[in-house]
Each structure stands twice: as C-alpha cells, then as structure tokens.
C-alpha cells in the first residue's frame, strides 16, 4: 500500500434559500489563505446546525465551492469570497465539487443499470489462470507416462 488516498470527484448544483442565520455554513480558502496546498479554492469548513445548508443536506464539510450564482470563485481573496456570499441574495445557486474517498471492496448494488458487484474480469481472470496451470500440469504429467 502506498499510503495515497484516491478520490472520486463529482460536481453538483445546490440551490439554497438564505435563512435567518444566512446560508448556514462557513468557508475557508482563497488566494491569501490556501486551505489545500497549491489550491486557492474556497472550501466548506463547517455546516451550521439547523442552517439552510444543514436542512438541505447535500453540502458537506470539505466540499469545494466552484461558483456562486454563476460567478466563478477562482483566484479570489478570502474576504472577496465572503463578500460574494453575503451579497448573493435570498436564493443562492452553488456549483459544488464533492470529493468522495474510493473504498476498497465489492461494488454495492444501487439500482437498475448500475454496477451490482465484482466486475466479471476480476472473477474470470483467476479462473482462466488456474485453467492454464491445470492444462499445463496435465500435459506435463501425460508426457511422463
């Protein structure tokens, strides 16, 4: 094992309605205070209980926010990003990047048309290898008789 964690990355559009406590989450990052090494993106650092984001349930701590109401968050100072969120209005559209760690083990069935187990090649390859070894051993044994 190399100690590296692989991730699946997915993007999602999340629409939130501002509540009494705002959008219900805190952010970190920006060009002046990078949260992730070599990445000046804006990340969710905390979801506030009973806030708009917590009630919606899709935004998670660690998610990268790519845009707010269509405005790209690349190369912004942290305070400029905060101001953009504060002035985004009542209905806010977020383009979010989720990073999900890849888990080892069999794929779980999720529904029609989706992967439902171990890929066929993973099963057939060892069976094929064992068959070749058995045939080789049989041929060698027969030559000795």
Swiss-Prot record:
Any one of the GO CC terms: mitochondrion
Which InterPro entries does the protein's record reference? PDZ, PDZ_sf, Synaptic_Scaffolding_LAP-MAGUK
The residues on the Cytoplasmic side of the membrane are: 1-117
Instruction: List the molecular function annotations (GO) for this entry.
Output: type II activin receptor binding
The answer to whether keyword Membrane applies is yes
Q: Which residues lie on this side of the membrane: Mitochondrial intermembrane?
A: 139-145
Indicate what this protein is called per its UniProt record. Answer: Synaptojanin-2-binding protein
